[in-house]
Every structure is written in structure tokens, then in C-alpha cells.
Amino acid sequence: LGEAAAYDCLYKEMSGQAGRSNQIDYFFGVNSAKSIANMSNVKKTISGHAYWQVWPVSEQIASRELVSSKVKSIPGLSLWETEYCVMENPGTAEIPGGSGPGRDLGMDSALWVARIISNDIAVANVTSWQWWVGISRGDYKDGLIHVDDGASAGHSWGDANYCKNDGYIRETKTLWAFGNFSLFVKPGMIRVQIPEQNYLSAATDVMLTAYKDVANKKMVVVAVNYGKSTRTYKLNLLGGTLKDNQMIPYTTSATSSLKKGAAVKGDKIEIAPRSVVTFVGSYN
């Protein structure tokens, strides 16, 4: 329910857009005449898109903190992120071309997206995250996979017959970075708190989220290293131990696409610069 165009529509009054404002209060607030909070056949979840409030990074963090706080004010309410592709204009220092137009098959856009996913999970506390769109014919940063005719980087909008019968398939690093989350973090898993994270400073360094599968005693840690230096961490589990003190890394970088590596010790987990790494292990 909701499908808000951006997170701020969920928690505040939008100038000149009363019909889009304060959607959490409207649908689930105790004082709302339109509240559906007590309808047993409606899932107690509000949804919104991750667009627009992603740059500068300080706004990305602040908006996620605000929507998380608002969701927590309604007992039992959860938040889904239901649509995102690159549409902002952060400049060429962040992504090739500086904005959404102009597809990017490389790691810069992949890290841009992975940062948003990580912060949506860790800061906004979303319980579901979706991308727009799977396959794109356009010269735009909207596809996990792109198709083209070999002569250009994509069609002009409206050309429905572009690559209709033949063409080339191009995978993106965004596809693989997305897989660092989606291949390993599954429904029913529980997110594990990582204490003492400064989300703002982490956003240009290393962002961490962790999850556990209680039934199978499985542990997953996803690290997004936005920085230019290798970072090393020691994994300490509160109330448990890492089986055999080891985890298997899966790395997406400029030279790797979800590449499985050799087992690493839990007391020396290394995250290469400009990479997304998923560590998978078991716990006792």
C-alpha cells in the first residue's frame, strides 16, 4: 500500500501536494478517519520509492532516519522499497555521465546503487527492496541487463522495434552487486544489529549489513566498500560463535562478478576497495 514517489511523502507535508503527504499517518495513524490499520485482510506495510533523496549523501541518511522513525511510531508497521533506478544528477565524480541518461555497465553505478540498498536496509529498515527494471533497451541507467544493436548504446525512447529480432546482451556490474544482496539474503532471515555504525561516514567508506537464518544457523554479511582502501574487520558474534571461524566471500568489483573466493577467517575479513563483498558462514 502507498507506493509513494519518494520517502518524504510518507512522513511529511509536501508543498502543494496535499494528496501525496503524510501517507503513514493517513493510512495507519490512530487519529486518521481513513485509517486501515485494523483491517485484518490488509498487510500492515507501507511502500515507497527510493528516488530523489539520495544525493547529497547527508540527505540520503537523514531521509532514511526520518522514515524509519515514522514507521516505528506505528506498532507493527513495516516498510518496503518498491522502485528505484538512477535518475538523480550527482555529477560525474559519482557516476559516469553524472546522471541517469547514458548507460553504465561498470562499477561506479553499481556502488551508487549498492550504497542505496545498504542504507535503505540499515537506516530506513526496509524489509523488501525492488529495482526498476530488469532488462533495458535504452541508453539509460535503468537496467540490470542491457540490449543493443552493436552500433549504439541503446535506442531512442519510443522505438519499440529496436533489437526486436537480434542484438547484443550486456550485463552490468549493478546486476552482480544487486546479487550480492538478493542471492544470499532470503525471506525469513533476520537482520543482525551491527553496533556503533556512523552511517554518514560509512557511506563513503564501508557500509555493513548482517543477517541470520535461525533455522539453518547461517550467517550472511554484506559489505559495500565505497572507498579506495582495503578495510579489515574482525567478526564478533554476541551470544554465538562462527563455525570453524571461517566465511566464504563472494566479490563484485571491476574485475569480478560475484566471484566465490577461498574461505577467510572471521577474525580477519578483508574488503577490497570499490567492491561489494558478501560473506557467508555458519554459526553455533
Q: Across the structure, where does each feature detected by a protein language model lie?
A:
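Aromatic/acidic polysaccharide-binding cleft in carbohydrate-active enzymes
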Residues: S78-L183, V192-S201
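C-terminal beta-strand-rich structural cap/linker in extracellular carbohydrate-active enzymes
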Residues: A262-N284
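Active-site proximal loops enriched in glycine and acidic residues that flank catalytic Cys/His/Asp
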Residues: E3, A50, E83-V86, Q130-V133, ...
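Carbohydrate-binding surface patches
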Residues: Y199-L242, R274
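Noncatalytic carbohydrate-binding groove/subsite architecture in carbohydrate-active enzymes
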Residues: L1-I116, V123
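Composition- and surface-driven signal marking solvent-exposed, interaction-prone regions
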Residues: E59-V67, E94, L144, Q193, ...
